[in-house]
């Protein structure tokens, strides 16, 4: 399962760890992903999405119905 938020599209990004001596070693910054069940009133069922914390805030703001409509237009399975 890929580490991508289904709502915002956030993915891992790369950067450097920096020691006290400023030596650089490669690392990945991972999104804060959670599998979360959302109740969809119109369909009378739960939908499980893999979303970041920011994605949950977007769902709180726009509503699950609007977000699911956006996912459908992108052709993403949920």
Swiss-Prot record:
SUPFAM superfamilies: L28p-like. GO terms for molecular function: structural constituent of ribosome. The keyword Ribosomal protein applies. Keywords: Ribonucleoprotein, Ribosomal protein. GO terms for biological process: translation. InterPro entries: Ribosomal_bL28 (IPR026569), Ribosomal_bL28/bL31-like_sf (IPR034704), Ribosomal_bL28_bact-type (IPR001383), Ribosomal_bL28_sf (IPR037147). The keyword Ribonucleoprotein applies. One of its GO terms (cellular component) is cytosolic large ribosomal subunit. Belongs to the bacterial ribosomal protein bL28 family. This is Large ribosomal subunit protein bL28.
